[in-house]
A protein has these predicted regions:
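Non-transmembrane, aqueous-exposed alpha-helical and coiled segments at domain scale
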Residues: 1-423
Length: 423
């Protein structure tokens, strides 16, 4: 399993793509098209949003699981783009139980974010939150509903009526035409019908057959709905437990859980970010690493690595190994810092606080490391990394209490140093 250990954009797609070479099945378990990830292979970048990263491998079954919320139009566009790039998506399976994102979800998302003004969350405005809200309210529409025209028509009619009332009366924006939406989505349903199946059944079948199954998380631990920096979080549970629920498997089947950690920290949108660098160092890292959102294009906030936050994330998902990414971005720096904990009024704070006002009053405690002046992007063996780079990586392991499994030194599949083989 691959889980983001920070605030997202850690490079999960690259790690999943690498591990998928030896996987028979890759399962996406939560989130929606708000989760952008990029796979680089053969010098070509493939930005993905709903597709599991294993789609690059023609013999790997790729499953969009029960916990995912699916924008059908976005998924079809992504499939067509991949086809145009020579990638065959015929190995895709879509869960009958997954919920569908509709245009009214997107418009509600946009309208509510605008209404919040200065209190905005920083949502991607892809309708993810409103779709999950319908799921919780038990009025959501699932993929299996779309496969039955009469069932779908009845459920859609109810939802369009309710959502139009909200949009027009509360937000003062235009609603939607039910007949047109029905026609559009029945068309999408027919295009996707060949890929739809009971993935709860197929996942267990593959496991029972002894297949190598890789579970791919979206977003990241610090954006978890319950345990992240609420309300500046996502609408699902991007932790190991959430993956179990979203993929419909029990926790004892999860082995080799990788926490993906960028060698520095980034965050998109609003919310607390204790180690943020609003200075030349932060700007330099952003430009070297091109830290702009895959989905939104927004510049990411940049900071030093927060080992306290990663240790908290490790506790949420019981990481077996860390996958350190973008270590090469730090090439040439004189000094590099890691946040090892927090203080308030000179006293150490042991927990990661829920109270965001309190969190913002904390002072990060840093440990400073010597940088390295060598270009490490061509290194393939851990022992060949510069001494200072190894010292930095090993400090991350020590401070988080999790051993190193993978070190990534570049965006491509080949730029990967494997410390621990899992397949």
């Amino acid at each position: 399993m691959v889980i983001g250990a920070q605030w997202g954009d850690e490079g999960k797609g690259k790690i999943v793509d690498y591990l998928a070479a030896k996987a028979d099945v890759v399962v996406r378990s939560q989130g929606g098209n708000n989760a952008g990830h990029t796979v680089v292979t053969g010098g070509k970048a493939y930005p993905l949003r709903l597709m599991p990263s294993g789609i690059m491998y023609p013999d790997t079954v790729c499953i969009v699981g029960t916990g995912v919320v699916i924008d059908l139009k976005s998924l079809l566009e992504e499939m067509n783009t991949l086809k145009a790039q020579g990638v065959d998506p015929s190995n895709l399976q879509i869960s009958t139980r997954a919920h569908v994102v509709f245009p009214y979800h997107i418009r509600l998302d946009e309208a509510e974010e605008a209404r919040k003004g200065n209190r905005k969350i920083g949502t991607t405005k892809n309708g993810i939150g409103p779709c999950y809200a319908d799921k919780i309210n038990r009025i959501g529409i699932r993929i299996c509903d779309l496969m039955d025209k009469d069932v779908f028509a009845e459920k859609l009619k109810y939802n369009v009526e309710v959502k139009n009332m909200l949009l027009e009366r509360l937000y003062g924006v235009e609603g939607f035409d039910y007949e047109q939406m029905l026609k559009d989505y029945l068309g999408y349903a027919e295009q996707l019908r060949p890929y739809v199946c009971d993935t709860n059944h197929t996942v267990h079948k593959y496991i029972e057959e002894g297949k190598n199954v890789l579970f791919e998380g979206a977003q990241a631990s610090m954006l978890d709905l319950d345990n992240g920096t609420y309300p500046y979080v996502t609408s699902s549970h991007p932790v190991a437990g959430g993956a179990c629920v979203g993929a419909a498997i029990g926790p004892h089947l999860m082995q080799n859980i990788f926490g993906v950690v960028k060698a520095y920290s980034t965050r998109v949108g609003e919310g607390p970010f204790p180690t943020e660098l609003n200075n030349e160092i932060g700007n330099t890292i952003r430009e070297i690493a091109h830290e702009y959102g895959t989905v939104t294009g927004r510049p990411r906030r940049v900071g030093w690595l927060d080992a306290r936050a990663v240790r908290y994330a490790a506790g949420l998902s019981s990481f077996d190994y860390l996958a350190i990414t973008r270590l090469d971005v730090l090439d040439g720096m004189d000094e590099i810092k890691i946040c090892v904990g927090y203080e308030k009024d000179g006293q150490p704070v042991e927990e990661y606080p829920a109270d965001l006002k309190y969190l913002e009053q904390l002072t990060p405690v840093y440990r400073t490391f010597k940088g390295w002046k060598q270009n490490i992007s061509g290194i393939r063996k851990y022992e060949e990394l510069p001494e200072n780079a190894r010292a930095y990586v090993e400090a991350i392991s020590e401070l988080t209490g999790v051993p190193i499994g993978i070190v990534s030194v570049g965006p491509s599949r080949e730029q990967t140093i494997v410390v621990k083989e899992v397949f």
